[in-house]
């Protein structure tokens, strides 16, 4: 019983760390876009309430992405269902940006934001894929060393 509880706790903690990482990453990307838009308009201060909305929105969407959409940005490959998951998340961000009036409901800027978020999701997908290849190669190297009896860590 103790092991099963400990394993469940580890799994939950691991999931929460992944969610935290992604929510912060996507929130930061949204804030960068928002701040660039402000700078282009000659505004040199950001609305803190908007920044809070961006963080909360990122957390909610990442939870949806993680638990309901199969975590599409960490897939091995981008099939139709994963692409639809990414598109769903991007559309949620775009709708929320319009709803919360982050970009003054400017349709051109909102469309740019949609394209920007698609590119962010694709970059995160590629980065995760590259990291998996690196991790796999490292584990294979460690396994080879272990089999030879040459482990040096």
Task: Cite the ranges covered by each PLM segment.
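N-terminal signal-anchor transmembrane alpha-helix
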Residues: 1-41
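Alpha-helical transmembrane segments of integral membrane proteins
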Residues: 17, 21-29, 49-53, 80-88, ...
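The feature represents the first ordered module of a protein
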Residues: 38-101
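Juxtamembrane membrane-interface segments at transmembrane alpha-helix termini
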Residues: 62-67, 122-129, 148-152
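A cytosolic-side transmembrane-helix exit/cap motif
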Residues: 68-74, 102-105, 126-138
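C-terminal halves and exits of single transmembrane alpha-helices
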Residues: 84-113, 117-130
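Short, highly charged, low-complexity non-transmembrane loops/tails of multi-pass membrane proteins
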Residues: 135-153
């Amino acid at each position: 019983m103790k092991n099963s509880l400990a394993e469940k706790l580890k799994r939950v903690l691991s999931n929460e760390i992944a969610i935290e990482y992604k929510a912060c990453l996507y929130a930061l990307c949204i804030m960068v876009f928002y701040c660039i838009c402000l700078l282009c308009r000659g505004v040199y201060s950001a609305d803190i309430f908007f920044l809070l909305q961006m963080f909360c929105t990122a957390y909610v969407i990442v939870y949806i992405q993680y638990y309901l959409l199969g975590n599409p940005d960490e897939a091995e490959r981008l099939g139709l269902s994963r692409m639809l998951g990414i598109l769903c998340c991007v559309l949620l961000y775009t709708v929320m940006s319009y709803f919360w009036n982050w970009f003054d409901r400017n349709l051109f800027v909102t469309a740019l934001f949609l394209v920007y978020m698609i590119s962010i999701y694709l970059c995160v997908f590629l980065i995760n894929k590259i990291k998996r290849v690196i991790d796999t190669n490292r584990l294979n190297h460690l396994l080879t060393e272990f089999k030879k009896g040459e482990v040096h860590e």
